[in-house]
C-alpha cells in the first residue's frame, strides 16, 4: 500500500466512513491516477476537469455515478492532501434532465404482507427492525444486543452515517418480537449475527444477507415493487409524515444532516398532499343541484 493510499484510508476511517464507501473512494482515486499514468498528487485542476468530461462524454456514465467519483476525488484532494482550492475546482456535475427518481414506498398493507412473509423468526425480526426504526442497512447489521434499551424504550444507533449517533424510539411490537427472537437465537454481541461462520456470534450479518431477507420476503408476499432495506427506510419515513410527524423530527430519527434530504418525503406522501386545503372549498357557492336546475330551465325555454 502506497503512503498516499494509507493516508487516505486512515482519514476515511477516522471520519467513520462505512467499509463500502471506503472501498469505493479508494478505487475511484486509483482509477483516476491510472487514467493519466501518474501519482494522483501530481495531477491538478486541468486533469480533474478533463477526467470528469471523459467520464460523462466518453464513458457515458450516469450523472449519479460521476457524482460518486467526484466525491471521492474531492475527499482525496481536500481532506487527505489538504488542498482546499480543489473544493471549487471540482464541482459536482448537474443533470440537465434531473433523472433523480423518487424512492419506492410500500403501503401499510404491503409492509404487513412483507413482514408476515419472512422466512424465519430472525428475518421477521430483521424486517421489523428495518421498518420500525428506519435504519440504514449498515446500521442494522452493526446493531448490538446492548444497543436495545427496553427500560428507556430506545434503540441506540452508535455507528450512523458520517459518524453520528442517535436514539430511535422502540416500538412495543418490535420489542416483543426481538425478545421472542432473542430467546430463540440468543445472540451475544451483534443482534443479527452472521450464520456463515463458526464464530458467527462475533460477526455482524452481511449486507447480502440483509438484502436477501428483503427480496425473498417480497417474492413470497408477491409484491411487485423492488424491495430493498432502503425501501423500508423510505416507507417508514413517509408513513411517519402521513401520520403527522413533523419533518424536523423525521430528520433526527433518520440521521439526516440536511433537512433538504428529509424534505423529499413530502413528494412521497399522498396524504400530506391530500391534506392541503384548496381555497376553492372556502367559496360560498350555490349548490350544484340548484345550479343544474337553473341551467336546464334556461335551455328548455
Question: Which role does the model predict for each range below?
Answer:
Residues 1-301:
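Conserved catalytic core of the tyrosine transesterase superfamily
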Amino acid at each position: 500500500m502506497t503512503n498516499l493510499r494509507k493516508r487516505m484510508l486512515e482519514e476515511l476511517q477516522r471520519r467513520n466512513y462505512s467499509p463500502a464507501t471506503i472501498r469505493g473512494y479508494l478505487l475511484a482515486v486509483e482509477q483516476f491516477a491510472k487514467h493519466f499514468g501518474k501519482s494522483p498528487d501530481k495531477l491538478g485542476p486541468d486533469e480533474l476537469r478533463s477526467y470528469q468530461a471523459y467520464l460523462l462524454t466518453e464513458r457515458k456514465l450516469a450523472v449519479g455515478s460521476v457524482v460518486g467519483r467526484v466525491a471521492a476525488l474531492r475527499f482525496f484532494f481536500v481532506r487527505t492532501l489538504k488542498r482546499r482550492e480543489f473544493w471549487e475546482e471540482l464541482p459536482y456535475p448537474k443533470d440537465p434532465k434531473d433523472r433523480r427518481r423518487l424512492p419506492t414506498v410500500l403501503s401499510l398493507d404491503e409492509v404487513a404482507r412483507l413482514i408476515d412473509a419472512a422466512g424465519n423468526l430472525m428475518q421477521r425480526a430483521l424486517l421489523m427492525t428495518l421498518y420500525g426504526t428506519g435504519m440504514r442497512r449498515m446500521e442494522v447489521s452493526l446493531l448490538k444486543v446492548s444497543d436495545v434499551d427496553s427500560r428507556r424504550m430506545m434503540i441506540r444507533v452508535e455507528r450512523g452515517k458520517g459518524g453520528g449517533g442517535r436514539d430511535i424510539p422502540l416500538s412495543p411490537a418490535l420489542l416483543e418480537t426481538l425478545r421472542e427472537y432473542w430467546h430463540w437465537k440468543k445472540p451475544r454481541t451483534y443482534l443479527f449475527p452472521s450464520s456463515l461462520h463458526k464464530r458467527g456470534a462475533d460477526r455482524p450479518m452481511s449486507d447480502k444477507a440483509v438484502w436477501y431477507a428483503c427480496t425473498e420476503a417480497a417474492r413470497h408476499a408477491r409484491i411487485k415493487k423492488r424491495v430493498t432495506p432502503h425501501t423500508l427506510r423510505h416507507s417508514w419515513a413517509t408513513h411517519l409524515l402521513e401520520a403527522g410527524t413533523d419533518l424536523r423530527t423525521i430528520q433526527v430519527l433518520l440521521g439526516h444532516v440536511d433537512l433538504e434530504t428529509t424534505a423529499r418525503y413530502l413528494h412521497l406522501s399522498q396524504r400530506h398532499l391530500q391534506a392541503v386545503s384548496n381555497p376553492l372549498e372556502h367559496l360560498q357557492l350555490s349548490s350544484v343541484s340548484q345550479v343544474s336546475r337553473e341551467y336546464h330551465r334556461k335551455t328548455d325555454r
